[in-house]
Amino acid sequence: EIQKNIQSMEQASNEIGAQIQAIQAQQAAAAAAAAAANQGSGGAGYNGAYVPANGVLTFPVPSYYGVTSEYGWRGDPFSGGQSFHMGIDLGASMGAPVLAAGDGRIILQEYHWSYGNYVVIDHGNGLSTVYAHMSAFTKPFGSVVKAGEQIGAIGTTGASTGPHLHFEVRVNGQHTQPRGYLGM
């Protein structure tokens, strides 16, 4: 039973990664088609090429009180076994603002049994960020957002042990250690 729960959570993360890759591929194809059609006619909005200043993203929870769970192997709080934690958990008060870590577009916004209420922002160049367990969304799906703009509120939805933000950085849909991207 424990191993089954761990495998189910890992499968959920892999499914989200595959969704991110598929959406990014669709967006790249649409952008290429639009660029070919417009041939440099300009325009406003998100250009799909966000590069954080000095390689550091905006911290998504300014009022956090600490990292409550690290990226990597850990004792799973639900199964009691070992599982790989695909992001970092930033403890904060219920309802505290969750901010976009960089300029981009909200490409996923839904409820998942494990991630709870979660958002994925595509920052372009294969970089995306995941914000999970939120109590509320403050921007609609498809919104273009700027770094530091509020996208949600701290919560404890899904498989959560208390109010926090589960934050992931994904490169081409694959999870990676987020600390370096946050300047931690």
Question: Where are the predicted features?
Answer:
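Catalytic cores of peptidoglycan-degrading enzymes
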Residues: 50-184
